[in-house]
Amino acid sequence: MLIIPAVDIKDGKCVQLVQGKPGTEQVVLDDPAGVAGRWESLGAETIHVVDLDGALGLEKNTGILKEITERVSVPLQIGGGIRSREYAGKLLDMGFERVILGTMAIENPAIVEELAGEYGSERIMVSLDSRDSRVVIRGWTEKVPFTAEEMARKFQERGAGSILFTNVDFEGLLSGFDLKPVSELVEAVEIPVIYSGGVSSLNDLRMLQGTGVMGVVIGSAIYRGLIDLTEALKYQDLK
């Protein structure tokens, strides 16, 4: 199980927000590329990058994203504001290993098939954010009438190589999470599932390991000192 530290970027800085809401910054650090490099130096094998400005439709972190790809050698996955096939391709060509498609994929599933055909399924991840057992889009503001399992099966057929599952009810709250929807999603598809949302302790990682997820994204907990990344990374070696 991969332990994947998150680097969320807003206004050129590395931040951590509560449930993704602007103005709720819990952590603000300069030099996002340096932060990513530190996580790599501690042993992270993949790093999760989110362009929070991009998620709001602002393409102003291109230079920082490029710097991260130049300073970090482990695989990078990037999400936030990917609203076109062209921009997804730009990020892949920039050096990101995987692009994470959210609202765009749900509103236009064919884009997943097109990008998978051009770049390979392994480089296309679809993000499914769930609230009250339904997938939400557009920055978690709009609910669609499908469960994460239903959507995941659909995108598997379209050629997605993996799924990022976020339980919005717990994201950024450091309050734990519900294992049941995670296990159900893993069982619903054959492609790998990565989980994000509410992880706040090493015990959480131990429990998630039993669900069969390929990896876990950790954000607030490592920035606020609740989880030591070095200790968390030991779970990568456990079977």
UniProtKB/Swiss-Prot annotation:
Its EC number is 5.3.1.16. Pfam families: His_biosynth. Gene3D superfamilies: Aldolase class I. GO terms for biological process: L-histidine biosynthetic process; L-tryptophan biosynthetic process. Pathway: Amino-acid biosynthesis; L-histidine biosynthesis; L-histidine from 5-phospho-alpha-D-ribose 1-diphosphate: step 4/9. This is 1-(5-phosphoribosyl)-5-[(5-phosphoribosylamino)methylideneamino] imidazole-4-carboxamide isomerase. It catalyses: 1-(5-phospho-beta-D-ribosyl)-5-[(5-phospho-beta-D-ribosylamino)methylideneamino]imidazole-4-carboxamide = 5-[(5-phospho-1-deoxy-D-ribulos-1-ylimino)methylamino]-1-(5-phospho-beta-D-ribosyl)imidazole-4-carboxamide. Disulfide bonds: none annotated. GO terms for cellular component: cytoplasm. Belongs to the HisA/HisF family. Keywords: Amino-acid biosynthesis, Cytoplasm, Histidine biosynthesis, Isomerase. NCBIfam families: 1-(5-phosphoribosyl)-5-[(5-phosphoribosylamino)methylideneamino]imidazole-4-carboxamide isomerase, PRK13585.1. The active site is at residues 8, 129. InterPro entries: Aldolase_TIM, His_biosynth, HisA_bact_arch, Isoase_HisA-like, Isoase_HisA-like_bact, RibuloseP-bd_barrel. It is found in: Cytoplasm. One of its GO terms (molecular function) is 1-(5-phosphoribosyl)-5-[(5-phosphoribosylamino)methylideneamino]imidazole-4-carboxamide isomerase activity.
